[in-house]
Regions:
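Divalent metal-dependent catalytic cores for phosphoryl transfer on phosphate-bearing substrates
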Residues: 1-147, 151-156, 160-164
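Long, hydrophobic alpha-helical segments that serve as membrane-spanning/inserting helices
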Residues: 162-200
Length: 200
């Protein structure tokens, strides 16, 4: 939430809205929490026993499940876009590759079958939450958190989303994206910077 708010403020968007949208964007994961990596405390991963297409359906359903929960618990409608749009129409790449590897070259395995239903982000704030969500997960997986490596990874991820058309429906400029990337890098580097080691 801090990441999205800081980036939104930096480009003159609504930082508070981006922060609150960040709090609610993944509420759909509450329906099937153990199918999501961040909730798997042990080695057992239920996706190991499932067909990749079924896994994709379960993962992508957290968007529609989120909207159902939001309506049930009277979440303000202004937050619905964050729930619906935080993955846009991006593919669930892990399960796409798993299906390709299991297919023996079957041409029936199509990338578009592994995409979220969308829609793509329609505001600067929902696009920022999309980028913050992607960035945070990817940077956590890195071993080298030096400022240059972090910013390089962030810019690569943003370029991939841009090339995939995810920002076609919102009014982000290239200048905005540069400011967002720099802000993300600064905030994340601050989180991962080496702590001072005190003598015992």
């Amino acid at each position: 939430a801090n990441l999205a708010e800081r980036a939104a403020d930096a480009i003159g968007a609504n930082g508070l809205l981006a922060r609150v949208g960040s709090y609610y964007h993944d509420i759909g994961k509450l329906e099937r929490p153990y199918y999501f990596r961040e909730n798997q405390l042990y080695e057992d991963n239920p996706h190991d026993r499932l067909d990749p297409m079924l896994s994709t359906r379960i993962i992508t359903s957290h968007v529609t499940d989120g909207i159902k929960l939001a309506k049930k618990y009277n979440v303000p409608p202004v937050l619905y876009d964050f729930i619906l749009q935080h993955h846009g129409t991006t593919p669930v790449i892990y399960f796409y590759h798993k299906a390709k590897n299991n297919s023996n070259g079957d041409p029936e395995v199509r990338l578009n079958d592994f995409r979220y239903p969308g829609p793509r982000p329609s505001s600067r704030e929902s696009a920022i939450v999309m980028m913050a969500d992607t960035t945070e997960a990817a940077v956590r997986a890195m071993t080298d958190h030096t400022p240059d490596k972090v910013e390089e990874r962030i810019r690569t991820l943003m370029r991939e989303k841009l090339d995939d058309g995810q920002f076609a429906n919102c009014d982000l400029t290239i200048k905005d994206m540069n400011v967002i990337a720099s802000t993300f890098a600064r905030v994340i580097t601050g989180i991962f910077h080496d702590r001072v080691k005190y003598p015992e």
